[in-house]
């Protein structure tokens, strides 16, 4: 079974959504997510994923250091800050960086904020579906 770690700063939005998506795209892959400064999973991220039928409501936010000794096939950073201060994963076979907009920066009404989360979710979905199809099948 392949192991993938997805990192962002707060482990509350992007990495959580990416974990849920990649898990749904590849049954033979164990996907983890973590943050360099973990926060509670964002309710808008939970709602955006629920719209796709993926439940991340029971996910927890974890610190990146918790996974330092796991032999990962892939370690992703999905924000520039996480890339800059990412812990070293000496056992990772491949480190990959792809920055996505932080939906937590969204302003406006709840529906306007949710729309931003849905947009980022769709970008994550396209990216990680392509990755899974080309690397995990």
What are these regions (language model features)?
Residues 1-66:
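Conserved active-site segments centered on acidic
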Residues 2-4, 67-78, 117:
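Cytosolic catalytic domains that perform sulfur/thiol-centered chemistry
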Residues 11, 49, 75-76, 124:
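Conserved small-residue
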Residues 12, 80-83, 102:
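Short glycine-rich anion-binding loops that position phosphate/pyrophosphate groups of nucleotides
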Residues 16-18, 43, 85-88, 107:
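Short glycine-/acidic-enriched loop or helix-start segments at secondary-structure transitions
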Residues 35, 79, 99-101:
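Residues at the C-termini of beta-strands that transition into short coil/loop
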Residues 70-91, 97:
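Mid-chain, well-packed structural core segment of small domains
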Residues 86-137:
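Phosphate-binding/catalytic loops
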